[in-house]
């Protein structure tokens, strides 16, 4: 096993520990004082041979964490460390000037982690409780990330899932971008070449045979739907179905004029005004993006900005992704 497992491995600390029988330590941030590189609830995995997955700082403390991980594997007892402000480790400084409390949990119960992995794969909101003294794990249906008495709770909301409808470079580039970062996604297109390019980028693809939102396509409150069509007559039937579901983001590429025409058509189809108000367009934080790459980054930034601010259950994605 390499000393530092790449993020591209596709595993997060929970899944990695659950599926690897080697002795491991879970390191999780239980408290933050001042600025911090990672949020409360962020975690990394450290194995007995020094291998690790994830990071809790910008490289300041990970090597030291590996040393302490070896110690807790030897004792079998959890341990909480303080780094930065107020830390006894005066030779290790955090450039941000803040402080971190980190719990080291030796040999976490793999059975609990396996069940947690299954729930997350099924896109279920869930949480896990960790007794900071005994290391006992409790699987919860939900919970707020933070320390409650002697139990530290981490909530896990599903990752944002992207449903990308469209044809051409914009749809291909955006799908490849979200795929490269590790977000679940599905590219739906009437165009064979678009689907081939998307599949070559590792995206899941589906042939869109007619302008409609597929009846068997399931969405949830962590779903983002984005349309990249130059042929705008495909949009209204798809948007009609998209706006009828719980997706937190629905947007379509196009100018302000195209947006106005789109809204009139949807209104004529009977879409309620409250649902029309949910439709984003022109999409993206950068106005008048002129190339597929800039547009893709712009749209992704807008979606993730909304994902971290909308008041739906589980918007705080402080779990171990």
Positions of PLM-derived features:
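ADP-ribose/adenylate-binding Rossmann-like module
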Residues: 188, 224-225, 229-230, 240-265
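Short amphipathic alpha-helix with an adjacent loop that forms part of the alpha/beta core around
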Residues: 211-221
């Amino acid at each position: 096993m390499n000393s530092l497992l790449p993020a591209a491995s596709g595993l997060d600390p929970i899944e990695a520990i659950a599926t690897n029988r080697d002795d491991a330590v879970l390191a999780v941030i239980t408290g933050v004082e001042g600025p911090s590189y990672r949020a409360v609830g962020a975690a990394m995995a450290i194995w007995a041979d020094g291998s690790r997955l994830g990071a809790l700082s910008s490289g300041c403390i990970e090597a030291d964490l590996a040393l302490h991980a070896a110690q807790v594997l030897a004792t079998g007892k959890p341990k909480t460390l303080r780094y930065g402000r107020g830390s006894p480790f005066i030779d290790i400084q955090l450039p941000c000037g803040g402080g971190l409390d980190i719990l080291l949990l030796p040999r976490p119960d793999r059975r609990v982690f396996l069940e947690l992995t299954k729930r997350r794969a099924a896109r279920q909101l869930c949480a896990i409780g960790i007794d900071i003294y005994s290391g006992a794990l409790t699987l919860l249906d939900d919970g707020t990330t933070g320390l409650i008495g002697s139990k530290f709770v981490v909530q896990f909301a599903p990752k944002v899932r992207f449903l990308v409808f469209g044809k051409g470079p914009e749809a291909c580039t955006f799908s490849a971008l979200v795929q490269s970062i590790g977000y679940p996604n599905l590219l739906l297109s009437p165009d064979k070449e678009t689907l081939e390019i998307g599949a070559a980028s590792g995206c899941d693809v589906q042939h869109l045979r007619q302008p409609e939102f597929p009846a068997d396509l399931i969405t949830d409150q962590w779903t983002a739907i984005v349309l990249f069509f130059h042929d705008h007559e495909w949009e209204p039937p798809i948007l009609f179905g998209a706006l009828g579901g719980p997706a937190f983001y629905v947007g379509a590429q196009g100018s302000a004029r195209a947006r106005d025409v789109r809204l009139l058509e949807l209104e004529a189809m009977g879409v309620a005004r409250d649902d029309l108000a949910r439709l984003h367009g022109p999409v993206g934080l950068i106005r008048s993006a002129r190339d597929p790459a800039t547009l893709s980054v712009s749209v992704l930034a807008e979606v993730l900005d909304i994902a971290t601010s909308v008041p739906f259950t589980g918007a705080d994605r402080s779990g171990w992704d």
